[in-house]
Amino acid sequence: MKRSLHLFLLLVALCSVVAACGNSSSSSATSTPSSIKLNIFAAASLTESFTQIATAYHQSHPDVTITNNFNGSQLLEQQIANGAPADVFASADMANMMKASNAGLVGDAKVFVKNRLVVIIPVGNPGQIMSLKDLARKGVKIDLEADTVPAGHYSRQALMNMSQSPDYGANFGSSVLANVVSQEENVKAVVQKVQLGEVDAGFVYRTDVTAAVASKLTILDIPDPFNVIAQYPIAVVKSSANAAAAQSFVDYVLSMAGEGILAKYHFIAVNP
């Protein structure tokens, strides 16, 4: 009888220990912080640089998972206005950021980098374009972003600037625009068509000529007096469910680490 009682008590004790361990394990699991998710809405021209920035930021903030949404700034602004779950907005122009700001969609914006336009032609040069003046030659096929796209707006400004110069002539801009055979929603679409040889030339940012496509393209620089320098602002979206983490990401972009990554992709520093 005593032996049976001892075995019973021992069994109860073992069950208590197992239960305690189970509770401890459960408590530990529930105390583990869940991953923070950030949705970054960034201009298409930031694709390569922000992909690397997101990776670098995650390495120092392993609890934060970043999803990038790259597209034309005008489309991103519309998506945010329509309620898309964005935490950070990085635009390729001030106009779309101001539109978002005036609608109360974003917080204070800061310019974090600049960019410049170039003309790209495919290797092999099917259009026989030797200089910018050749863009006005009848029959040349040019791809350009739509006027609502920052790069498209800047390109038209540059053409207007060149038309003011006797080196190009008053009709230069209109002649170039008459050769436009397609208008795209973002710069990456222009790069794609040019590198495939579907058109003879296209207007993009210098940063769009990345290592992945450089061997398939030739760059024609637009002289500084006529070029348009794009300013890129960044801001936290007010509806963000993770505003503190979103601000931390913005701060990283503005930091020396972020500037260093952007410089690798030929962006122009705000204060060079």
Segments predicted by a language model, with ranges:
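Central helical "cap/lid" subdomain
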Residues: G104-K110
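Bacterial N-terminal signal peptides that target proteins for export
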Residues: M1-F8
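Exported/periplasmic ABC-transporter solute-binding proteins
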Residues: C21-S60, T65, Q74, Q78-N82, ...
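Residue-level signal for mature regions of secreted extracellular proteins and peptides
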Residues: L14-C15
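Periplasmic-binding protein-like
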Residues: D87-S91
